[in-house]
Amino acid sequence: MRKVILKLIRFYQKYISPLKPPTCRFEPTCSTYTYQAVERFGILKGLLLGFWRVLRCNPISKGGHDPVPTEFYLFKKSNNSLRRR
């Protein structure tokens, strides 16, 4: 099943994405990010990460470099838990 999902993403990248103007605000692109996430974490977690990434890719987002995490989590971990007062 993982191979089917990865082939669908590649199909999108090869045949559908070139028909649209580039709008992704992130590097790697959202489709590449999702592909890498599915490879790294499997179908469920990979697609969840990809879906969350697409939701974050919008006009009010700064965008920038956002690689697939090495550990699975949907929300970025904060270092504010040990704030000094």
Swiss-Prot record:
UniProt GO cellular component terms: plasma membrane
Keyword terms: Cell inner membrane, Cell membrane, Membrane
Subcellular location: Cell inner membrane
Protein name, entry field: Putative membrane protein insertion efficiency factor
Listed InterPro entries: Membr_insert_effic_factor_YidD
One Pfam family matching this protein: YidD
Keyword Chaperone found: no
PANTHER family in UniProt: MEMBRANE PROTEIN INSERTION EFFICIENCY FACTOR-RELATED (PTHR33383:SF1)
Originating organism: Fervidobacterium nodosum (strain ATCC 35602 / DSM 5306 / Rt17-B1)
Database matches in HAMAP family: UPF0161_YidD
Membrane topology label: Peripheral membrane protein
